[in-house]
Amino acid sequence: MNNIFNSPLEMGVRMVYLLLSLYPRKVDLQKLVYLEYAAVYSEDLGGPTSLHTPVPMRGGEHISKRDIIERGLHLMSARSFIDVTYDSTGIYYSAGENGPALVGLIGGTYASQLLMSCEWVARNFGDFGINELLFLFDKKSLTWGAEFSPLEVKGN
């Protein structure tokens, strides 16, 4: 792995932060893709200062993000940073028993801001269903990427 940016490792660590903030909720991949955007570009949704520079057409960076997030979740689940459960309605992710230890080991300004942003996302959008998130982001006229298919999701 030559580049840590936008890698499964970076996405996996970000998912640990997000899932710890959402705990004890269990969420599916599609919801995590939305919530990850909300955590990184929180200012777009009326939240704290965005973690990353809100460049024009930033939705284009999400074209392959869903796959990277999924690989990051797999990477983090192999070490119990993230738990994976499934039932007849789908696959769900939640904070794993080793998640708090990982977050506790990572220091620095970015990590503190990431935690603050993830906690804001959890408070404001953690209980939203997928259709509520679709409506919110459509209403805000955000430029999303190709990973958000026009698939209609029933329920959450």
Protein language model regions, located:
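Exposed, interaction-prone assembly regions rather than primary DNA-binding/catalytic cores
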Residues: 107-156
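Intrinsically disordered, low-complexity, basic-enriched segments
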Residues: 4-6, 10-11, 45, 59, ...
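Short, amphipathic alpha-helical interface elements at domain boundaries
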Residues: 1-60
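Accessory beta->alpha helical hairpin/"wing" motif in late/C-terminal subdomains of nucleic-acid enzymes
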Residues: 84-110, 114-119
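Amphipathic alpha-helical interaction segments
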Residues: 42-46, 80-83, 106
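Generic structural signal for hydrophobic core residues of well-folded globular domains
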Residues: 19-23, 39, 76, 106, ...
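Basic amphipathic alpha-helical segments that dock to polyanions
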Residues: 69-80
